[in-house]
Amino acid sequence: MNPIVVKFGGSSLATAAQFEKVAAIIRENPARRYVVASAPGKRFDGDTKVTDLLYRCYDAACAGQDPAPVLSEIRQRFADIVDALHLSVDLEPDFTAIEAHLRQSPQRDYMASRGEYLNSKLLAAYLGFRFVDAAQMVLFHADGSFDPDATNTAIGHTLVSIERAVVPGFYGAMPDGAVHTFTRGGSDVTGSVV
């Protein structure tokens, strides 16, 4: 049976209840072995997408303002999912790394990508799949353009021995390892290349 790649957007992964629906869809068909996940989207009218909150953190840090209040809101969004699904995932080291990044040398693409990164870790834990960082497989040229040849090679080498995986959408890595994002909606691109 050929593996199927499925991609779920932000509204599909905004809450624990949505995670449960996504898991049911994936478990319906054993061929659905690879999942590309977005950052949590809006939970209700008037809510803010996690990616937009991450951009606010970046903007605050660059303006010399304290990003902690917005980062606390992001942390709580993920904690709500962890608690409701009873996951034994500790995202605190990830948030510590994000805070350090904001203090030292904020990079917009790195910040924007953390929603996909963290949500994919949670979804992988919930499904019992392996988490594979997109920065290991989705590659860009030095000029920031997508490198399909290097990406296809990296995906082949990485996923050949992994039965089931969750991969964050929206970003990959530059030749120097720096995180680089696609434009908004780039998780769809990740889904198509995986």
Residue ranges and their predicted role:
Residues 1-194:
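Nucleotide/pyrophosphate-binding catalytic subdomain
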